[in-house]
Amino acid sequence: MFTRNMTIADYDPVLWQAIQDENRRQEEHIELIASENYASPRVMEAQGSQFTNKYAEGYPGKRYYGGCEYADIVEQLAIDRAKELFGADYVNVQPHSGSQANAAVYGALINAGDTILGMDLAHGGHLTHGAKVSFSGKIYNSVLYGITADGLIDYEDVRQKALECKPKLIVAGFSAYSQVVDWAKMREIADEVGAYLFVDMAHVAGLIAAGLYPNPLPHAHVVTTTTHKTLGGPRGGLILSSCGDEEIYKKLQSSVFPANQGGPLVHIIAAKAVCFKEALEPQYKEYQANVIKNAKAMVEVFKQRGYDVVSNGTENHLFLVSFIKQGLTGKAADAALGKANITVNKNAVPNDPQKPFVTSGIRVGTPSVTRRGFNENDVRELAGWMCDVLDALGKENEEQVIAETKEKVLAICKRLPVYPK
């Protein structure tokens, strides 16, 4: 039997301690991983709702279980809000993740063994864009395009590869690209070879929702995104389209359910509905504008301190810092910054001489720090502290600099908490 006053703290103190420790870690560390963000208490409330108990196989108005009348309301709310937010004609809110959303798109549009053309993981793409270790590179014949030495997509290279391999589907989108993708150009290439254009906008969905980054929906046959990252919602996936082809919409529906998934996570869909409502608020655009401003401000500090920034800047929420010139590794930088309570991730950079698990760079993103209230002056100061740590790597004063930086980090985290009381 359950009672509403039951707590994890009373029942499972080991798990409770891990939860408390993670809460403290998030409050006392500066989060700069570009794919992470802080969900609002409202989003987390929805995730912890009684909808976690409900099975709802099927779609609103056409379920395989009874008792879904309120699940229907929740899912339709999420669908309608996502349509309004992105200007989409078709939306599926059921994918459990971005990767599962992508798998559903492949399953709807192409067959096993068909050729896909996507961005190389080592050049800023994603595992599901054709990497050989992913289902997308195992089930399909994947051909990869990359970026130039300047860190920009080489559209002529994309076109030439498309003409050579005649893909059934071209994937546009990224996990580590700091410039604006020309969606219209990618569609032009896709049309030239008779391919579908599939855009994974997971990293920039929040910026697109705010009107600060080009919307791919007018150009792509299908678009996917995660609902966390810049959007700032729960961990989950989303499929959208405005291509006007009802047959594609039907294929997408059946590719999600029953082909790839069974019952949807209604509590997560409820949290998505909250996230979309938050993204429709006027202040959301201001938040996303500050995300970009903060990224640009940090870039300038790194450049002033002698560090190379891939593509020489950023037009979104992230940027890559290359340490090839300094002879440092991303792995060492990641570890040293982590000791100072600054969380980043090591990342491959153009012409990287290091192995993928070592790398010669880091990826830095500003959605999380911006959400906790960091302004341009704060992030300039933060970037300076990061450069102090990087400058000291391998030197006698390394540990001292890390310790001093950690104290500064703790002070600013106390001033700007993630979840103020």
UniProtKB/Swiss-Prot annotation:
Subcellular localization, as worded in the UniProt entry: Cytoplasm
A biological process from GO: glycine biosynthetic process from serine
Signal peptide range: none
GO cellular component: cytosol
Known EC number: 2.1.2.1
Pfam families listed in its UniProt record: SHMT
GO molecular function terms listed in the Swiss-Prot or TrEMBL record: glycine hydroxymethyltransferase activity; pyridoxal phosphate binding
Highest rank taxon of the organism: Bacteria
Cofactor(s) needed for function: pyridoxal 5'-phosphate
Catalytic activity: (6R)-5,10-methylene-5,6,7,8-tetrahydrofolate + glycine + H2O = (6S)-5,6,7,8-tetrahydrofolate + L-serine
PROSITE patterns hit by this protein: SHMT
Keyword list, A-Z: Amino-acid biosynthesis, Cytoplasm, One-carbon metabolism, Pyridoxal phosphate, Transferase
Annotated metabolic or biological route of this protein: One-carbon metabolism; tetrahydrofolate interconversion; Amino-acid biosynthesis; glycine biosynthesis; glycine from L-serine: step 1/1
Binding-site residues for (6S)-5,6,7,8-tetrahydrofolate, renumbered to this chain: L121, G125, H126, L127
Site (Plays an important role in substrate specificity): H228
Complexes and interactors: Homodimer.
Family according to the record: Belongs to the SHMT family.
The protein's name in its UniProt record: Serine hydroxymethyltransferase
Originating organism: Haemophilus influenzae (strain PittGG)
